[in-house]
Amino acid sequence: MERLTLPPGGAQAVDEYLEYRRIVGEDDGGKLFTPEEYEEYKKKVLPMRLQNRLFVSWRSPTGMDCKLVGPETLCFCTHRYKQHKTDFETVPQQRPIDLPCRVTGCQCKAYHYVPLNGTQPIRCRCKHFADQHSPALGFTCNACSKCSGFHSCFTCACGQPAYAHDTVVETRQERLAQGKPVGQDVPYAAMGGLTGFSSLAEGYMRLDDSGIGAPSVDVLDSPVSVMDHPFLRAMQPPSTSSPQPLAVGPSTQISSLRKPEEDDMAYFERQYQERIKMEKAAKKGKALPPPSTQPS
């Protein structure tokens, strides 16, 4: 593998370019804006983008967002979401909202998500792949004359067939009215339905219902308790203000490790007994004794 060497300031230049590409997307037509054009673009587009962001998802009949569309998510026309019209000075009043493809010569008039079967396109009932169909409304097959329009019986991970899902384009207010996450306002182009790291997972696997992803400051700054992971307890610095300091140091770290002679049941039983002792000591207001490091 070739080793890349950057000159002084090169890493910062790379970060600035990535920031530029996330904000501008495909709007520069492949030619970089000058610094003046870039600043003018941000003054014009960013307020509009923050106010009129559209959230795009692929929704099942049960109301679950099985797929949250992002900048790189492919459309039925095989072009990415970021290559479609996503910024509006005024949000259209008609529903559904059409997001036409901006690639020259493409017949796609509205963004339409189609799932993949692993890395391959799914098949229509005419036995041809999705990318063998026309992106024009009706989605007729280009490889046969019997197909009346793309219709796939591919089953989503939620248990519903693909044809029962809909590509939904909605505003922030419409999404909040349904109790769905909207995340934080970001200036980047074509963010679609992405609201956090958990948005990359499929709907049935998405455990973070907040959609923001990162825990709040209150959670991050909360004191380490006896119920936390042994690693957090071991790395917790001693506190002079807490009346019930946790025992830290090598003894705590050793206690959390499995001893060579211990089987599974003995290890978990020792961990359980140590936790019970720590909880009892905490209730009595005493300093927590360091856990035993002797073999049980």
UniProtKB/Swiss-Prot annotation:
UniProt family annotation: Belongs to the FAM221 family.
Protein name: Protein FAM221A
Pfam families linked to this entry: FAM221
Composition skew (Polar residues), residue ranges: 237-256
Highest taxon listed in the record's lineage: Eukaryota
Signal peptide residue numbers: none
InterPro entries: Fam221a/b
Annotated organism of origin: Rattus norvegicus (Rat)
Region (Disordered): 235-263
